Regions:
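Short conserved beta-strand and strand-loop elements enriched in small hydrophobics
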Residues: 144-150
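Glycine-centered tight beta-turn/hairpin loop motif at sheet-sheet or coil-to-beta transitions
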Residues: 151-155
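Short, well-ordered, aromatic-rich surface patches in folded extracellular/luminal domains
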Residues: 163-178
Length: 192
């Protein structure tokens, strides 16, 4: 009833309502990127254990020739969905910078897997891990972060936390090839 009365008043007085639009552009606050922790991804498989950053889940090996995965693990080898390993746009680089300090994904420097090796180099001390001969353990190198350009062209930063089942704090005696890692996806501008 009130709406009818207001409409009648507006029509009878020939008043056009004004709509206010602010003159300055309002930019929404940037949402801080989420950090996801994946525990005990079993990489004791052949050929690989495939993983998607977008879904936060492993991907069936039958999807290896698709863009549904970004990164794959087999023992200490890490492959990306690009180059010789898959049809995606993925690439990687290892930075000697702590995970928390990386706020922006580099625009270049990403390598793809090739016949001569993976984008993320293997071998003790040359990438994400070192082999400690005194305790016969594979240990992540503190302060190393892997930057990934995903299969779809976005960016993720990744830190390997443990290579052993259950992420033991002491000298590992548990099963190996069980990756625990944390990652964060960037926004569309490559910011974390």
């Amino acid at each position: 009833m009130l709406n009818i009365l207001l409409s009648a008043i507006l029509i009878s007085t020939d008043v056009t309502p004004e709509i206010f639009f602010p003159s300055e552009t309002i930019t929404p606050a940037r949402i801080k990127s989420e950090i996801v922790v994946v525990k005990d991804l079993n990489a004791n498989t052949k050929p690989y254990a495939y993983f998607s950053f977008a879904t936060g889940k492993d991907v069936a090996a039958t999807e290896a020739k698709t863009r549904k995965w970004d990164i794959a693990f087999s023992k200490t080898t890490i492959a990306v969905n690009g180059g010789t390993s898959g049809p995606g746009q993925a690439g990687a680089q290892v930075l000697e910078q702590p995970f928390e300090l990386i706020k922006q994904a580099p625009k270049d420097g990403y390598k793809t897997d090739s016949e001569s090796g993976t984008a993320i180099p293997g071998g003790s001390g040359s990438s994400w891990y070192k082999y400690d001969m005194s305790v016969h353990a594979i240990l992540p190198i503190v302060g190393r972060t892997i930057l990934i350009k995903t299969a779809e062209g976005r960016f993720a930063k990744l830190e390997i936390i443990s290579y052993y089942k259950g992420s033991p704090e002491e000298v590992p005696t548990e099963e190996s090839s069980y990756f625990t890692f944390r990652y964060s996806l960037s926004d569309e501008n490559g910011k974390f």
